[in-house]
Amino acid sequence: PGAQQLMGRMFDPKAEIEDMDARGIDISVVSSSTVLQGTSWADPNTDLELCRRCNDQAAEWVAKYPKRFAGSFVLPLQDPKRALQELERAAKTLGLKVANISSSYNGVYVGDPLYHPFWEAIQEFGVAVWIHPEGIRDPWFQRYALWNSAGQSIEEAKAMASLIYEGVMTKYPRLKIVMAHGGGYFPHYLGRLDRNTANRPDTVRNTGGNTPSTFLRSFYYDSCVYDPLVLKVLLERVGADRLVMGSDYPVGEKDPVGWLRGCGLAGEDLAKIAGGNAARLLGI
């Protein structure tokens, strides 16, 4: 189907449940698209209002279909003060389970000290965080749709680097951060990253001297990588207990559980990735 028809299903809970049933999915985490609905272009008041509307609708879906949906929420992180207010409302009042954030806001990446109070609050509330970039606006990446095929994975690597090198993962060790698309390129260049810290020990001044690879298992990763070999590397490096199933619904894998099976997963590992780990993260 055309993109418009596919995206239409994303905004119709009954249609999404039909697709879930067809794919053997019991529970889906409702999420606003950070690509389509990224709001850091807006002024702070408009940004907050757009986020509140998205979060209210997510809560409505969960209230109407509590056995089929868990809710995520978006935040106006270009303004950390407003973001903290909406975080408390979304987590405590609406009961939503996952903060759905981008890799950066107006050029400031999520590990920046500006956002450390946000991460402190996230750890205190105990909610999970899913990081999915809004997209790369650099003109070069618009050619050949590279903003999506290459750019997203670059952004995910930059987000992980920001969180590690700026000390977030050291200061707040109980964070539950899920990286979209298997963390992009970051998990696959650890040798080069660690070597650089050996040559430049000043680069790990915020990590207690720990190398980047030390923090790989501090994150969770979704399985939406489209390549069995990439998934195999993630399994070897972080283990099945740090992976959760991703689908890129409604435009990604039509059968995400079947894809995992096709990668050779079975038994306990399949059970963890297909649902067990996510249930633990969400507390359901």
Each predicted region: which residue ranges?
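Catalytic pocket-lining loop regions of alpha/beta-barrel enzymes
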Residues: 89-244
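Short glycine-enriched, charge-decorated loop/helix-capping segments at active-site entrances
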Residues: 43-48, 147-148, 259-263
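Short glycine-enriched loops at secondary-structure junctions
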Residues: 33, 77, 133-137, 249-250
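Mid-domain alpha/beta scaffold segments of enzyme catalytic cores
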Residues: 1-103, 113-114
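Mid-to-C-terminal alpha-helical segments outside catalytic/metal-binding sites
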Residues: 1-27, 56-64, 85-89, 175, ...
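Amphipathic, non-transmembrane alpha-helical scaffold segments
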Residues: 47, 51, 55, 157-161, ...
